[in-house]
Amino acid sequence: MDNTLQKIGVVGCGLMGAGIAEVCARAGSDVIVVESNQERADAGRGRLEKSLRRAEERGRLDSADEVLGRIRVVTELGDLADRDMVVEAILEDEGAKVELFKQLDEIVTSPDAILASNTSSIPIMKLATVTKRPSNVLGVHFFNPVPVLKLVELVPSLMTADETVERARTYVDGELGKHAITCQDRAGFVVNSLLIPFILSAIRMYESGFATAEDIDQGFVLGAAHPQGPLALADLIGLDTTMAVAESLYAEFKEQLYAPPPLLQRMVDAGLMGRKSGRGFYTYDS
């Protein structure tokens, strides 16, 4: 078996998918990104171009065009047939991810190819068991913004082969220049199991009228040396994503600290998703 991962596929070209595609292409990999329709594909391509041009202008990249030349954005999952690893980066919806993994299992031809998920909360076992290659299914969870943050969580299920984990680790650490940690296959993994209760506590404090959003956030920026406060961070993550992760954690552990506050549910229902919608706990310019 050739253990190297050279041909990478990414499903989804939103904020996370585009970031994953960018860092893989910047590392020299051949990357194919799949979006659900041409409009989304064009938007994803534009997102990649904007990010890479900005990196070039800031002197962090020699040639944006060279990196863009290693990325194809398409609309057919079948184009992923020859990939060494495919990273799923679609919406945080268990049913949608399960269906996608069923399709990828039929499409990706190499029996050694890794099928990876960028899920931030869904147990990997639920995705692995719908494939005929559960030993090659792994969580590979990047953090937003992907080109900036170094951490990647590697999440093997009980059925993931040790060799699969090590191949992914070699790529993440060696090729991408990031730092991989390994964590158990439980909802939220390491970072979100700690982060989400912190954010939810801040939302409850704001909801109760205990303090303003600005004062809550400034308390942690100026008093705890955090780069940003919990409510601004929730806006950056996306309130819909924060809600989905909280629901997944609460469903698995039934602990009150993971229960989404009513205000968070109302904001998501109203379409107030944070930065990506222009309004969350703060208002943002388009």
Residue ranges and their predicted role:
Residues D2-T4, S29, E163-E166, D173-Q184, ...:
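NAD(P)-dependent Rossmann-like dehydrogenase/reductase catalytic/cofactor-binding core
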Residues M1-S51:
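NAD(P)+-binding Rossmann beta1-loop-alpha1 motif at the extreme N-terminus of oxidoreductases
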